[in-house]
From Swiss-Prot:
Name of the molecule in the record: ATP-dependent Clp protease proteolytic subunit 3
Low complexity composition-biased segments: 1-13
Gene name as annotated: clpP3
Organism from which the protein derives: Streptomyces coelicolor (strain ATCC BAA-471 / A3(2) / M145)
Main localisation: cytoplasm
Localization, UniProt: Cytoplasm
GO molecular function, one term: ATP-dependent peptidase activity
Job of this protein: Cleaves peptides in various proteins in a process that requires ATP hydrolysis. Has a chymotrypsin-like activity. Plays a major role in the degradation of misfolded proteins.
GO cellular component: cytoplasm; endopeptidase Clp complex
Catalytic site positions: 108 (nucleophile), 133
Annotated NCBIfam families: PRK00277.1, PRK12553.1
Subunit description: Fourteen ClpP subunits assemble into 2 heptameric rings which stack back to back to give a disk-like structure with a central cavity, resembling the structure of eukaryotic proteasomes.
Length: 217
């Protein structure tokens, strides 16, 4: 399991390890109905189980139709950085545009995944709350172990800052400063910051649409 979470955690006990999302928690029949609409729902913490599910659904939908948008709906408190990066890399891997929608609560890695949707297709519902902060991890062991873990945490932090900056238009320095403590955004504030492109109230605004392949027709 990833030792890094996008949020504070007790020493040696990362938040994502406090209880990975059981596979049975998600209603399979409901998931199938959403997939028929090309909608992937991340409605839990980001951990190995939920990330594998989301990645698999993105890959399946892309294989079925590589030209039509896929929607990722986010209502998540965040969790494992490495699990979240697996989802991000899969979003970049497939040729489809992936729109994102914040519904309810998008915090930490939930905020990250919301922000990295396809430009122009990142949405938030009016009463959604978005929270950004830095990755963290419990660090312990020998002096050498602590140095290695600290270097790895710094690398992870810089990676998240760089990617977030690329997708929001903010500088990495601004992302680092603003994420030093929990920073909360309303949907409109998230739009102004560059995390989302539009605050929406209608399904017509976020319904998946046919799109060209990123690499050509």
């Amino acid at each position: 399991m990833s030792p890094f979470t996008a949020g504070p955690a007790p020493a040696r006990t990362p938040r994502a390890e406090e209880g990975d999302t059981p596979a049975t928690r998600f209603d399979d029949r409901l998931a199938e109905q959403l997939l028929d609409q090309r909608i992937v729902l991340l409605g839990t913490q980001v951990d190995e189980v939920s990330a594998n599910r989301v990645c698999a659904q993105l890959l399946i939908l892309s294989a079925q139709d590589p030209r039509t948008d896929i929607s990722l709906y986010v209502n998540s408190p965040g969790g494992s950085v490495h699990a979240g990066l697996a989802i991000y890399d899969t979003m970049r891997l497939i040729p489809n545009d992936v729109s994102t929608l914040a519904m309810g609560f998008a915090a930490s890695m939930g905020q990250f995944l919301l922000s990295v949707g396809t430009a122009g297709k990142r949405y938030a519902l009016p009463n959604a709350r978005i929270m950004m902060h830095q990755p963290s991890a419990g660090i312990g062991g020998t002096t050498a172990d602590i140095e290695i873990q600290a270097d790895n945490l710094d690398f992870t932090k810089r990676t998240i800052e760089r990617i977030t900056a690329e997708h929001t238009g903010q500088s990495p320095e601004t992302i680092s400063r603003d994420g030093d403590r929990d920073r909360w955004f309303t949907a409109e504030e998230a739009r102004e910051y560059g995390m989302v492109d539009q605050v929406v109230q209608s399904l017509a605004d976020v319904r998946p649409a046919a799109t060209r392949r990123r690499m050509g027709l």
